[in-house]
Amino acid sequence: MKIIGISVRTTNQNGQAMQDIENLWERFFSEQLLAKIPNKASDAIYSIYTDYQKDYTEPYTCIIGVEVTTFSTIPDGLEGREFPEQTFQKFVAKGAMPQAVGAMWQHIWDSDATLNRTYIYDYECYTEKSQQGDASEVDIFIGVKE
């Protein structure tokens, strides 16, 4: 999967990720990056969590962007990253956003000991389904070992 977008290095400690990722989303929309990224595979927006120092309790990188078919043109100020195929366990956050996503992540963290996560990368996929008010849905994919 090839992604072009913007990123931030953050941590879940002391609520830092909530602020950093919220600021990243604000930047993504205020700079109208969806419209500026060429060669889009779709209009789905991905929030990818990668470069884990160890696990969800340690620093990691969040990238917000879109899947592209090629890296032939990467706009200034954006970055391109390619992610390998891996096995995922899918979770679906349902309800008002972003609260539903936050609640699902809490469930994932609470289940960490049994998920057998890879910590290579995980991602959320935002589509038209994620903009339906209290009936919104966001798919969350957690990388797991086979």
Each model region followed by its residue ranges:
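A solvent-exposed interaction/effector surface
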Residues: 1-146
